[in-house]
């Protein structure tokens, strides 16, 4: 019998698994009881939770379905979902969790016609993705090569070795008779034949109709025989793990099915291609062929010089659709730093739908528009940007023109926009919450730029604050959530307010955790004023001095895996998600003029709502 605190851990861990990972198809009360008992056994012994998922073999050879043989946005989104669950379990249970992904390529290698080199490239790239989220110690991708039972075998012998060491000869010999006496087994067999006929259609195209049917029967039977051998191997080596599955199973306490994507269907990234539908703001999981044949303007998005996913836009006219199809789309990182570059002369930014731009910025953190028609006057940018909301009003107007003729510019510390509003805005944290006054987004337009050191290019730095929140151990993340800093601007004009913020909070847009932190060293840009910020600890369970805390935050946010160096060019328009991004700038020598605007948050209690402005004016 566990004490109340440990029993609460069991409930918390169960909720995380049920809420974030498990599909719960045909769930039974017995299945829930069994799951909780497995978790209870770990907690009773202060043991690490162990999860096992046989999956992620390789990309299919069918290029009607996928973009290539390497992992892409699909795999990244699934792995990031796993990392999120791992961090949340760590936050409520200090021993944490180890999540094993057992790559089952060798189990089925004789039937899927994928080169061994492609499998190893695929697995290596998966590990790099996990490493980019700083989770390699807890999300492990393993294979037969990691187990003594397969010592002495070469990798092309693992397929046969699995059958010889862990197979059930009687199951294989009596397969036809067993299939006729077990409806579930027969349905699995028929389902495999149907799936593999479609998945391997290019490989099977050289066969006659009769030979193709024979080969499909051989493949379906062979995969079921190998699957049974794999089950025996996994039971022998991972018998103490909670067994997860990418296939649909009733939740009765044996195998727990997963939805890999937010879409509640049993789809896998190695048989699919991702498309971000900017009209809805959601990823769509489907075959490459179906995406390309869907309505709208479909653009390939590149990352690390290879196809990564698709992007769907809409156009008002056929002519505009043709122009938008010429856009080049690239990502700096796996899921942040989108660049849309026009390769067509005289394409205005108004050709892009405002709602779709907002969805892109919300999802990818920053969106750079390059090569579009330039704004000749601030009012042009103001008129365009205010189509989708009211701008934050400053004493000097809605557009902040940050022009400098200085030859040397110091680095701009990391921060987020309007973290310390000027006193004339009347923002008081006793009256307003973070989401009441913090702009959801802002834009930076590079009107002119000359850099004497770097060939006309200077870098603005952005940090993926959402990735930062899952890159740290869940236990530390919660300590940072319970740590608050007071930021006090060191200036007399325009008298910005001192504000208090936790280091980790929830994004009002996406509801994901984000890091909220500003570097105290250096000068921050507040309208046309530069000032330094003093930070002091208001509350913290782990820190009593600012210096070691700032050192740790510099380690987290200074990680190159989280940072994007935006090589700003003249005419670039940078749209920024102010909640999921921290911004800074590198030092440079030269001249630069930037125009900046922020949109008011869509809160009924915004300081710029008429009723609040009237109240503030009366008080003034």
Give the positions of each predicted feature.
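Long C-terminal appendages of very large multidomain proteins
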Residues: 258-300
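Terminal domain-start leader segments
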Residues: 36, 327-421
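N- or domain-start disorder-to-order transition segments that initiate the globular core
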Residues: 1-52, 301-358
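Histidine-anchored nucleotide/phosphate-binding helix
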Residues: 74-94, 352-357
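Active-site environment of non-heme Fe oxygenases that use a 2-His-1-carboxylate facial triad
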Residues: 304-348, 405-620
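Hydrophobic beta-strand segments of well-ordered beta-sheets in folded domains
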Residues: 47-52, 93-105, 139, 232, ...
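Short loop/turn segments at strand-loop or loop-helix junctions that form parts
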Residues: 45-64, 100-109, 141-149, 444-447, ...
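A substrate-binding/cap region within the structured catalytic cores of diverse enzymes
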Residues: 105-264
